[in-house]
Amino acid sequence: MRLHRLLLVFLLMVLLPVPGLLKNIGNSVSCLRNKGVCMPGKCAPKMKQIGTCGMPQVKCCKRK
């Protein structure tokens, strides 16, 4: 029985994502939370892309 508990804990540790490591920006709300701006096409000069805003053509950009 102890082995089952140990295996369950190990699987939970492996399968659950670490909150700090995965900062996936895929919609406009998460873009705004990360102090970004949604822009169609490419990001403006002096800005870097940090994700997308729902569609691949709309980029989430943030000042460098």
Swiss-Prot record:
Gene Ontology BP terms: calcium-mediated signaling; cell chemotaxis; defense response to bacterium; defense response to Gram-negative bacterium; defense response to Gram-positive bacterium; positive regulation of flagellated sperm motility involved in capacitation
Cellular location of this protein?
Secreted; Membrane
* InterPro entries listed in its UniProt record: Beta/alpha-defensin_C (IPR006080), Defensin_beta-like (IPR001855)
Disulphide bonds annotated for this chain are C31-C60, C38-C53, C43-C61
Keyword Signal annotated: yes
Principal location class:
secreted
What SUPFAM superfamilies does its record include? Defensin-like (SSF57392)
Ranges that cross the membrane: none
Give the signal peptide range: 1-20
Q: Tell me which UniProt keywords the record has, alphabetically.
A: Antibiotic, Antimicrobial, Defensin, Disulfide bond, Membrane, Secreted, Signal
Pfam families in the record: Defensin_beta
Molecular function terms, GO-annotated? CCR6 chemokine receptor binding; chemoattractant activity; identical protein binding
UniProt keyword Secreted present: yes
**Mind telling me which GO cellular component terms the entry cites?**
extracellular space; membrane; microvesicle; sperm midpiece
Please give the residues making up the propeptide in this record.
21-23
For this protein, the record's PANTHER family field holds:
BETA-DEFENSIN (PTHR20515), DEFENSIN BETA 4A (PTHR20515:SF2)
Query: What is annotated about its quaternary structure and interactions?
Result: Monomer. Homodimer.
Function recorded in the entry = Has bactericidal activity. May act as a ligand for C-C chemokine receptor CCR6. Positively regulates the sperm motility and bactericidal activity in a CCR6-dependent manner. Binds to CCR6 and triggers Ca2+ mobilization in the sperm which is important for its motility.
Similarity comment text for this entry: Belongs to the beta-defensin family.
Query: What's this protein's name?
Result: Beta-defensin 1
Write down the species: Sus scrofa
